Amino acid sequence: MRTYRYFLLLFWVGQPYPTLSTPLSKRTSGFPAKKRALELSGNSKNELNRSKRSWMWNQFFLLEEYTGSDYQYVGKLHSDQDRGDGSLKYILSGDGAGDLFIINENTGDIQATKRLDREEKPVYILRAQAINRRTGRPVEPESEFIIKIHDINDNEPIFTKEVYTATVPEMSDVGTFVVQVTATDADDPTYGNSAKVVYSILQGQPYFSVESETGIIKTALLNMDRENREQYQVVIQAKDMGGQMGGLSGTTTVNITLTDVNDNPPRFPQSTYQFKTPESSPPGTPIGRIKASDADVGENAEIEYSITDGEGLDMFDVITDQETQEGIITVKKLLDFEKKKVYTLKVEASNPYVEPRFLYLGPFKDSATVRIVVEDVDEPPVFSKLAYILQIREDAQINTTIGSVTAQDPDAARNPVKYSVDRHTDMDRIFNIDSGNGSIFTSKLLDRETLLWHNITVIATEINNPKQSSRVPLYIKVLDVNDNAPEFAEFYETFVCEKAKADQLIQTLHAVDKDDPYSGHQFSFSLAPEAASGSNFTIQDNKDNTAGILTRKNGYNRHEMSTYLLPVVISDNDYPVQSSTGTVTVRVCACDHHGNMQSCHAEALIHPTGLSTGALVAILLCIVILLVTVVLFAALRRQRKKEPLIISKEDIRDNIVSYNDEGGGEEDTQAFDIGTLRNPEAIEDNKLRRDIVPEALFLPRRTPTARDNTDVRDFINQRLKENDTDPTAPPYDSLATYAYEGTGSVADSLSSLESVTTDADQDYDYLSDWGPRFKKLADMYGGVDSDKDS
């Protein structure tokens, strides 16, 4: 529908003030236009001033979203100078002029060419002016007016999120806050109810509710259980116009998840479990697994297992597998089928975290009975002790019984057991054991001073099943017997001054004993009976395992007796008494007035001879000269014994090659020069062997010189014959070592032992006639026949 508005500008001549009048208007919207009078004054030839009415307007109103086929009429502009003759021209400028808004330049009618949207631009400011069409000059000042776009309800509410996600604990009270949703409306909130939004719930009842004005979603049902239903989808509607009929609406989806609380106790799926385990299971061995189910999740489903009652509280244990939430029953102590075959346990499963507000639901734990059957296993023998300690005197004879060990089969069969000694622990086979009763006895003599403790291992093995065996350590202590005599702790050699007084101490003696008596050592010292009478010295026993040598007279003469050998008898007080005689050497020496030794007879024991520096230098020079002389003499002798460069004629035709040299090429690449055979004059005279000199020397025989055309074969034969008849040629009477020739050779082996083929071909009886030196050899070779006979 087109809306018309006419603005009439009236001019009244002769009135002293302007008069406002209401313009004619047609407006379907019912909004009255405000009147505004703009007075423009003009000059006239008469002195009478006249006031003119110019534009009368303020603003236009225009509905948005116009859907008509024609342009939407906005209003009309009119000037009082417009006489209808087309002399004026109306011009429009400002927001949307010429595009959104056009004006009829003749009539001043304004129209909208496009559909307008208030949400895009609610106000347009334009300017209007009337000009003289002929001169182009404005006849009225330019004036500004406003076109306001009137809002209609053309926008539905839009939520800030398409999908909301929220959580709320299960078992919550009614009215528990869940989440708040928000929707906005682009319409003008200041005009009508187009932007007034009201919330309502379309889906999700009776579990949840929503506040109509705030959009807050709350729980509407008591004790919603996650285990029954965990996910909920709620659809919320936002409607404008205050929810009235004809209002626009929008919806959103809220996905609500119930979070878990610990409202379910653990429960065993069965009341009784049974497992089997062999009695040989070591501590820590898992026997079986039990599992209680808990409908909760996360930490609310964590379970702790414990043994609360039963016959095996101290024999078994239960641990919790944190990954699978299973209870693992393990062996805590060693089991014995012969003692107990069946155990009954009570295992409890409980939640470590319990919310007090759910205690009314009952105890958060459950129990089950576990029956464990112990299976019999063929066990090795068991010794009566973990270790044995025995004692024996070191003077015990061979086959002396020390003690015994005992082991038996723990199984019900009671298989017999045999005993043995682990020879890796008794390499010298000092001990042995009776395989039947386990008695330990000696097989060799013992010596405590050699080894005090003997640590061996005894093995007990089932006769019917040798694989079943066990070991036990056996510690044998050798008890001491007084079988060692005491002796001096060191070699004693002392001196006495010539001017010594009687009863003067010249040496303190100490003794040691390899034995270890229970009451400790107690030694006694005395002079040997043969030296006790007429001795120049006496022995004083200090009763503390030491003794002192005292002078018996005043003064000693080293020229009469320079050395005294003093035999001292050392005895112990153990049984049987052991004693030994040690000799103390006492030298008579010259001493100073302080008693310090200066010289003893013709030699000094401690002090140097007192040579002067010059004498020492002379001695050193003599030693150097002597060494130089020896070195020169040895060098001259070596020069004289240098080997000659010329080799013997026997070696002329020989190529000596060492074939045991690996690498470096072969040495026989330099073959014998055949030219030597053709030039015998170049051969030197025969020379004797350098390594062995014969006892009788013969003059070398000169061989005739062969002609140049002498046949090589004749020359070689001549040389061969010459060497065969030469007494100076080898072999000499010396030891020669030959390699094994083998049996394929015509000469067989050169070994005399291989010269006969069988033992029967050689008679060794003659070796017995060679005397006692060859008796061993005669026994070796003469006993062959007897061995065969046997």
UniProtKB/Swiss-Prot annotation:
Cadherin domain mapped to chain residues: 54-159, 160-268, 269-383, 384-486, 487-608
GO BP terms, alphabetized:
adherens junction organization; calcium-dependent cell-cell adhesion via plasma membrane cell adhesion molecules; cell adhesion; cell migration; cell morphogenesis; cell-cell adhesion mediated by cadherin; cell-cell junction assembly; homophilic cell adhesion via plasma membrane adhesion molecules
Q: Which domain of life is it from?
A: Eukaryota
Look up the record and report any one GO term of the cellular component aspect.
adherens junction
Which residues does the propeptide include? 19-53
Question: What is this entry's stated membrane topology?
Answer: Single-pass type I membrane protein
Q: Which InterPro entries match?
A: Cadherin (IPR039808), Cadherin-like_dom (IPR002126), Cadherin-like_sf (IPR015919), Cadherin_CS (IPR020894), Cadherin_Y-type_LIR (IPR000233), Catenin-bd_sf (IPR027397)
**Pfam families named among the record's database cross-references:** CADH_Y-type_LIR, Cadherin
The stretch of residues making up the signal peptide is 1-18
Report biased composition (Polar residues) as residue ranges: 269-279
- Glycosylated positions are 49, 255, 399, 437, 455, 536
The organs and tissues expressing this protein are described as:
Highly expressed in brain, cerebellum, and kidney. Lung, pancreas, and gastric mucosa show a weak expression. Also expressed in certain liver and kidney carcinomas.
What CDD domains does this protein map onto?
Cadherin_repeat
Q: Which residues lie on this side of the membrane: Cytoplasmic?
A: 637-790
| Phosphoserine carried by residues | 786, 790
Q: Which GO terms describe its molecular function?
A: beta-catenin binding; cadherin binding; calcium ion binding
Ordered alphabetically, the record's keywords are: Calcium, Cell adhesion, Cell membrane, Cleavage on pair of basic residues, Glycoprotein, Membrane, Metal-binding, Phosphoprotein, Repeat, Signal, Transmembrane, Transmembrane helix
For this UniProt entry, which segments traverse the membrane? Answer: 616-636
Residue numbers spanned by region Disordered:
259-288
Q: Which residues lie on this side of the membrane: Extracellular?
A: 54-615
Compartment(s) where it occurs, according to its Swiss-Prot or TrEMBL record: Cell membrane
Domain notes for this protein: Three calcium ions are usually bound at the interface of each cadherin domain and rigidify the connections, imparting a strong curvature to the full-length ectodomain.
Stated role: Cadherins are calcium-dependent cell adhesion proteins. They preferentially interact with themselves in a homophilic manner in connecting cells; cadherins may thus contribute to the sorting of heterogeneous cell types.
Protein's UniProt name = Cadherin-6
- Source organism per entry reads Homo sapiens
